């Protein structure tokens, strides 16, 4: 099994991880409902790409 010959320093470790960060979610304006929502998701009112694909009052329980 391979084992590192030397301990990785804090600077080396942190500089390697420097590009790893959180990104803001892609929000888009939904003209049908007049609200902002996440991309590629059904809106809370049940609309997707301008068409109603789910009922607003229907709630699913995954118990």
Curated annotation (Swiss-Prot):
Map out region (Disordered) in residue numbers. Answer: 1-25, 42-63
Q: List the disulfide bonds.
A: none
Q: Where is the composition biased (Polar residues)?
A: 54-63
Q: Which UniProt keywords are listed?
A: Ribonucleoprotein, Ribosomal protein
Q: Where are the transmembrane segments?
A: none
Q: Name one GO biological process term.
A: translation
One Gene Ontology cellular component term attached to this UniProt record is: large ribosomal subunit
InterPro entries on file: Ribosomal_bL32 (IPR002677), Ribosomal_bL32_bact (IPR044957), Ribosomal_zn-bd (IPR011332)
A GO MF term: structural constituent of ribosome
Q: Where is the composition biased (Basic residues)?
A: 7-20
SUPFAM superfamilies in the cross-refs = Zn-binding ribosomal proteins
Q: Record's Pfam families?
A: Ribosomal_L32p
Q: Which family does it belong to?
A: Belongs to the bacterial ribosomal protein bL32 family.
Name assigned to this protein? Large ribosomal subunit protein bL32
What is the organism field in this record? Lactobacillus johnsonii (strain CNCM I-12250 / La1 / NCC 533)
């Amino acid at each position: 099994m391979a084992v590192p010959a030397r301990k990785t320093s804090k600077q080396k470790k942190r500089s390697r991880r420097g590009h790893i960060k959180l990104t803001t979610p892609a929000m888009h304006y939904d003209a049908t409902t007049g609200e902002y929502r996440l991309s590629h998701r059904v809106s809370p009112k049940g609309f997707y790409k301008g068409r109603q694909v789910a009922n607003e009052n229907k709630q699913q329980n995954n118990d």
